[in-house]
Amino acid sequence: MNDDGTIRIFYGTQYGYEEEPDFLTNGRLDDEVSMFGRTKEEILGYKDSIMGPIMVVLEDDMLTVKEEPRHIIPYAVKGTSFEEHPFFEGSSMRKVGDKYYFVYSSWQNHELCYAVSDYPDHGFTFGGTIVSNGDVGYKGRSFENKLNMTGTTHGSIECIDGQWYVFYHRLTHKSDYSRQACAEKIYIAADGHIDQVEVTSCGLNDGPLAAKGSYP
């Protein structure tokens, strides 16, 4: 993200949180030792874990890290606004006006969520779910009554010709690895809130595809 001349990169994933504090004691711990060049004791003792949504500032060469990595939302979610929708992966940051919108895939494993802050690296408050690939939560729908096979979704929001959209993927062929790209119109209210939108097959077409001709 080019934030008025400051280059920021957002990354990370989160395997386990308070409910699984010993998650990294399995084979993944050896991977972390190799990746980060630290001892097991250093990794297990790291405040807020080495996992989670992380931001670093880069030099203009886009290669050199300028500052220490920092968590942008809490790793420990109990008692926070993120308790029901902890971060899993898929960090994406957008600036809307003077607010920062952090879009991410949650541990619910079917939704794109967002959080809002005045700052790019702290102060985020959970905003809500933008889209669920099973329409879970849309107009109160329960997970038991989901409308499609659910699984991890990734994506973000973008403004095109004055209209905001959410881009994401849903699953096909009953496989978590068969993913169909989708888009829906969204609306950012004056107070910054984004209502959850329904999954459709219209995408950017502004309506159902005409039943004639051919499509790539």
Report residues per predicted region.
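Carbohydrate-active catalytic/glycan-binding domains of CAZyme proteins
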Residues: M1-P216
